[in-house]
Every structure is written in C-alpha cells, then in structure tokens.
Amino acid sequence: MAAPPARADADPSPTSPPTARDTPGRQAEKSETACEDRSNAESLDRLLPPVGTGRSPRKRTTSQCKSEPPLLRTSKRTIYTAGRPPWYNEHGTQSKEAFAIGLGGGSASGKTTVARMIIEALDVPWVVLLSMDSFYKVLTEQQQEQAAHNNFNFDHPDAFDFDLIISTLKKLKQGKSVKVPIYDFTTHSRKKDWKTLYGANVIIFEGIMAFADKTLLELLDMKIFVDTDSDIRLVRRLRRDISERGRDIEGVIKQYNKFVKPSFDQYIQPTMRLADIVVPRGSGNTVAIDLIVQHVHSQLEERELSVRAALASAHQCHPLPRTLSVLKSTPQVRGMHTIIRDKETSRDEFIFYSKRLMRLLIEHALSFLPFQDCVVQTPQGQDYAGKCYAGKQITGVSILRAGETMEPALRAVCKDVRIGTILIQTNQLTGEPELHYLRLPKDISDDHVILMDCTVSTGAAAMMAVRVLLDHDVPEDKIFLLSLLMAEMGVHSVAYAFPRVRIITTAVDKRVNDLFRIIPGIGNFGDRYFGTDAVPDGSDEEEVAYTG
C-alpha cells in the first residue's frame, strides 16, 4: 500500500489553537481577505457583489491574458521571466528535463495563488505557469446551448482535452516552445489567437483534474494537493465567476450544486492520495510553501550546467568541420580585416569597413540557399534559363547587441526579409550565457533562418540561439550561423552540437584566452561599433554583462 501524502501545516498559534473542524479553513480565509481588504471582518456577504447594483464589471473572461508581460509582480518585488541559463550540455542536447510541479485541488481552492507564492519564493527567473483552464474542449452547438443555461458539466474529466495537455507538457519539459489555447468563459470557446509559452527550468501545472490522467501523472515530478474548506471554495467561486467571468449568482449556485460539488466528491477528492504533499488552508500555509521551495531548489541544483567551461575543454585538435565556409581571403577582404582589427582605427572607419564586410558575408551566405531551375523571358522575347530561390521565406535573427549591426546588410540584399531578435548576455558571476529576451516572427519553422552575431568565441551564445530556433521547430539544416570573426573553439562547439547547421564567416582565429576573448581577435565589437565603454572581463560575443 502506498504511503499517505505528507501534510504540511502552518505553525500552530499558542493563543488560538484550532478547535473546530472548519477552523483551519477559516484561518486561511482570514489571511487571504486581510491581504486584500486590510480588514479582520469575516463575512460571506462581504465577499459577494451587492445584490442591487447589477452585474459587476467584467475583469477577465479568458483563461489567460494575451498581453501578459513576461514577469510576475508581487508585493515585494518584480520577478522577470528572463535570464534563462543554459538548458542543454556541450553537445547541444538537454541533459535533464525541466522540473514539473502539479497542483491539484477543488475549484477555487487557491491553486493559482499557491502557484504564484511558490514562484515568488523560488526566486528562479524562468518559470512557466500552465493552467488547465486553457484546455477545455471545443464545445458542439448542443453543448454550447447547455453551457449557456448552466447545464454543462465543466468539472468532469471529459470536459478537458487531455491529449493536448499531455503533448504540451511534454514539449515544455523538453525545453521547447508551445502554443497554448486561450479559453473564453463567456462564449465557452477558444479564442482564435493562441499564446506562446517558452521552455523553462520549472513548470507549474495547476488544475482541478491535474491528477486525473495516468500519463499526465507520470510527467509530474512533484504532486501537490491544495485542500481548502468547501464553504470557502464556494465563496471564492461565487466571487470569481460573478466578477471575472460575467456569470450571475443563480447560475453559479445551480452549477455548483449540480456539477461542481458532486464532481469534487467523485473525481477530485480521491486524487488527494496520489499527492506527494497536501497543503491544508492553501495560501495561508507558509510552512508548506517553504517545504516545497526547499525541495525544488535541491532539484534545480542537480540540474545546473556549466556549458562554457565544458566547451573550452572540448573538441581540441580536430580539423575544421565541413559545414564551415570561410569567405575567400582576397587582398580586399584581408585589407578590410587589417583596418577593423587595428586598435588605432577610428570609430567611423571601423563602422564603414565592418559594413562592407557584412555585405560580402551576406552575399556569400545566400549562395548556400536552395535554388531551382526556372525560365524567364527577356525584354527581347527570348527565354533565359536561370535560377530562383526554392524555399518558402528567409528570416534573419540577430543576437543582440552586436548581431543587430548586420541587419542593414541583410535587408539590402533580401527584399521583404523578416527580422527577429534574441538577447543573450553573460552572467558576470557565473560566466555562463543567459537568455533574456526573444522576439521571433510567426511560423518561422518553415523558413531558412540566417542567425547573425558579429563574433563567436566559445560558441556558448551561438549554441543557445540555435537551441532557441530548434525549440521553435526550425529544422537544423535550415539554420545558417553568420559571423564576421570566429574562434576555432566556437566553430568546433557549434558544429559538434549541431552538425547540420551551416557556419559562415569571413575569418577564423586560432585560440581564445582565459577571458574567452578571441586571439588575435577584433576586440569587443559592440563597444567599438556603438562607441560605448568596454566592459572589463567580458567576452567578444557577449557585449553587455548581466547585472541582475
């Protein structure tokens, strides 16, 4: 017989010990309402909208906000979902999956509140909160009619699209991006636009049926059941559905008595035995939150990776890969390299000759795109057998900051090219690259992608950028990595991890020093191009040190 789940309780109060069955639930409710109203009054009527004032203004009627920013604002601080450290090893593969936490419990038990408290206490920047509310099935016309009259059971396992939930969670655990539907509770349908979620170190999945599917259970590394008194859950549901989802009191109570309460007793309450931790009183139980956070921290420590150090010691004494193409070193190209490498070169000259090299590099890279035979007619009415681009579209993605300087050269030779950006910076404390921001065009998976960065030393930032593209389902053989200058170490690292990525540059230098600078190198390209002060101990490919 399986051991019963652990119950994490709050510190008992010496002055007011719990004496009644519903005391813990009331204590949690007091804690929650005190945060909202700064009042100790405990009245169910106070939590409901005034009867005579009509329906409350609708605040949010969908499962999630489409314009939700990539951050979590709390009473203490703002936690940005940025600065993600490497989620792969030196081979370019994910060595360990993300840590997935499942939060189950009855409707309005405080699962989302507990999830946000865990996120705040974790203080880990890359966390994804995935709500089961987004995965309600698309209703038929008959079911739509039933839902409009509060006669459809949304608290039954059949109401959820478990196939989509499982596939979404699997991709997130693999570090890939996913599309999540946005469910409209007023029309009981999915919105046309879906929200994009990106892979993270920690995934928190919450929902009333979080433990109702065996396959789903196997994906969860930690299972938490939020146990809240039924009266409190009813009050919270009334307040939420009336003020946020545009429902009326009679309809909410009818649905609760007919579907919600019976479904809780039949499907949700029995899953408590499957939980690793049971959290009584929900958000009021700080001891439980601390226990959960400590365990997650220990799991994350086991998943820490040091990619840059591994890259520096790997792939030594190997011949340059066949996927590398170096622009022919003509006297003109070598002359421009002489100018931009010279520390005495003025900023104006540095920019001018860098742009010339970029244009040549882009033109050279385009020759590796797929072309097919085509025939056109000349103005003289004669046929000409030529070539035309055989792909769907070309997209340029620049690794900020220095990679942005290559965008004008790409636009000059590729008409109507789409541009995306990725911000990767070095954490000055760990020396590891961190992903801070990305903006990619839609449907990028079918495009040939030109990834641009002006210098590549160890290849750590370039590998992270390639991983981002792969997580967006861009085929590896459709990615072209372009750089004005590379070190042999960076070339080997990228080619070994991603053997089908085409690497194109104007020159390859032999070595990298202890500060991960290319030798003889070009200096810090971003600082020389933009005229900013150099960052001590920074690398060529990471121009701005992380200060968070």
From Swiss-Prot:
Keyword Ubl conjugation listed: yes
Compartment(s) where it occurs, according to its Swiss-Prot or TrEMBL record: Cytoplasm; Nucleus
Catalytic activity: uridine + ATP = UMP + ADP + H(+); cytidine + ATP = CMP + ADP + H(+)
Protein name as annotated: Uridine-cytidine kinase-like 1
EC annotation from Swiss-Prot or TrEMBL: 2.7.1.48
Organism whose genome encodes this protein: Homo sapiens
Database matches in PANTHER family: URIDINE KINASE (PTHR10285)
Metabolic or biological pathway, per its Swiss-Prot or TrEMBL entry: Pyrimidine metabolism; CTP biosynthesis via salvage pathway; CTP from cytidine: step 1/3; Pyrimidine metabolism; UMP biosynthesis via salvage pathway; UMP from uridine: step 1/1
Gene responsible for this protein: UCKL1
Role noted for this protein: May contribute to UTP accumulation needed for blast transformation and proliferation.
Region called Disordered, residue ranges: 1-78
Superkingdom to which the source organism belongs: Eukaryota
